[in-house]
Curated annotation (Swiss-Prot):
PROSITE patterns noted in UniProt: G_PROTEIN_RECEP_F1_2 (PS50262)
Family matches, as PANTHER family: VOMERONASAL TYPE-1 RECEPTOR
Membrane topology, Extracellular segments: 1-16, 72-93, 156-193, 259-269
Annotated GO biological process: response to pheromone; sensory perception of chemical stimulus
SS bond list: C85-C172
UniProt note on tissues of expression: Expressed in a subset of sensory neurons located in the apical layer of the vomeronasal organ.
Stretches in topological domain Cytoplasmic: 38-50, 115-134, 215-237, 291-310
Native source species: Mus musculus
MF-aspect GO terms: pheromone receptor activity
Protein's name in the database: Vomeronasal type-1 receptor 50
Length: 310
């Protein structure tokens, strides 16, 4: 079989990947539960809480799916059939795309929410949840269509000696795809991702400019020293910038590893490193929300206190 078959013998990669998935599932579960409680207990729940809850459940499903795929990569208990391979890998690819999309739309919604009344975005404040929902539904259909080729190209691996397939797990492989088809799919994915990253960059830049103007006006109006405590706007801005910076860095690393993997003909180490990097955002992004939200900090602290007392 291909070198990818040696994955199950690499204990370091196995431990790293399963640790990442476990931490990510725990963090996203906490983030989802906290914002679900907010939505259920508040009289007028904020749209941003709804989208953070959705963002966390999408990442949670992504990591659970990755965990199932990782089991077949490192600890195969039995061969999957083609239907199982196609369903899980298609769902995983779809959830990765939706996580990308949810990150972008959450960034845009936060920008609209933080914009002042004098801003040109004020008219979108009441309509933004509906527009964001419509945009997400559109991207969901788009990602489903982009990933539909996997339902044909993914098969169960029956011939363990063939070098013509690109091995995904011990049970699943990808059929060879023509160069023209690969080029078309790559171009479409690049355009889609460039658009979303550009939208994230614009919204993040807009928030930074707004915050800078706000601080400048505050210094002008109050000559006395300002409070050292960060305002909700400042905490929200730092959250946006941290998420944006973390996302871009991991996206660049993921692209570099992907190109290296193609150059070195699917070396198992590059394959596994790419998987770890491509799921790092889903694992660690919840901690950005947890560390920048007072409600989240109180919830986690009280929960840890109860566990210690037990």
């Amino acid at each position: 079989m291909s070198k990818a078959n040696l994955l199950h013998t690499d204990n370091n990669m196995k431990i790293t990947l399963f640790s990442e998935v476990s931490v990510g599932i725990s963090a996203n579960s906490i983030l989802f539960v906290v914002h679900l409680c907010k939505l259920l207990h508040e009289n007028k729940p904020k749209p941003i809480d709804l989208y953070i809850a959705f963002f966390s459940i999408t990442q949670l499903m992504l990591l659970i799916t990755m965990g199932l795929i990782a089991v077949d990569m490192f600890m195969p208990w039995g061969r999957w059939d083609s239907t199982t391979c196609q369903s899980l890998i298609y769902l995983h690819r779809l959830l990765r795309g939706l996580t990308f999309c949810a990150t972008c739309l959450l960034n845009v919604l936060w920008t609209i929410t933080l914009s002042p009344r004098s801003s040109c975005l004020t008219k979108f404040k009441h309509k933004s949840p509906h527009h964001i929902s419509g945009a997400f539904l559109f991207f969901c259909v788009l990602y489903m269509s982009f990933s539909s080729h996997l339902l044909v190209s993914i098969i169960a691996t029956f011939n363990s000696t063939s070098d013509n397939f690109l091995y995904v797990t011990q049970s699943c492989s990808i059929l060879p795809v023509s160069y023209s088809r690969t080029s078309i799919l790559s171009t479409m994915m690049t355009m889609r991702e460039a658009f979303l990253i550009g939208l994230m960059a614009l919204s993040s830049g807009y928030v930074v400019v707004l915050l800078w103007r706000h601080k400048k006006q505050a210094r002008h109006l109050h000559s006395t020293s300002l409070s050292s405590k960060a305002s909700p706007e400042q905490r929200a801005t730092s959250t946006i910038m941290l998420l944006m910076g973390f996302f871009v860095v991991l996206y660049i690393l993921d692209t570099v590893i992907f190109q290296a993997r193609l150059k070195f003909k699917d070396v198992s180490t590059f394959f596994c490193v790419k998987i770890i990097i491509s799921h790092s955002y889903a694992t660690f992004s919840p901690f950005v929300f947890i560390c920048n939200d007072k409600y989240m900090i109180k919830f986690v602290t009280s929960m840890c206190g109860r566990i210690v007392n037990v």
